[in-house]
Amino acid sequence: MAIKKNNFEEQLNELQEIVNKLESGNVPLEDALSEFQAGVKLSRELEKKLNDAEQTVAKLVDKDGNEKALDPQNASAPEEE
């Protein structure tokens, strides 16, 4: 299965389709290995997107849930307390 560059939700749906196909047990071994590899790759891409989103939120919100004012010069690094 070719992995397309889609948005998060589309990739998550694609991963779920792979999981469902593999769980059905009706996939030849070679196809199952190919699907598994595609699923692992998708999983890693999704994890990276989630980590990136988490870092973005951490830059915008402090530990108490209050919005931070971003310093454009330091926008790439969250403040440490």
UniProtKB/Swiss-Prot annotation:
Residues 60-81 are annotated as: Disordered. Signal peptide: none annotated. It catalyses: Exonucleolytic cleavage in either 5'- to 3'- or 3'- to 5'-direction to yield nucleoside 5'-phosphates. Its EC number is 3.1.11.6. InterPro entries: Exonuc_VII_S, Exonuc_VII_ssu_sf. It holds the Pfam family Exonuc_VII_S. GO terms for molecular function: exodeoxyribonuclease VII activity. This is Exodeoxyribonuclease 7 small subunit. It comes from Lactobacillus johnsonii (strain CNCM I-12250 / La1 / NCC 533). The gene is xseB.
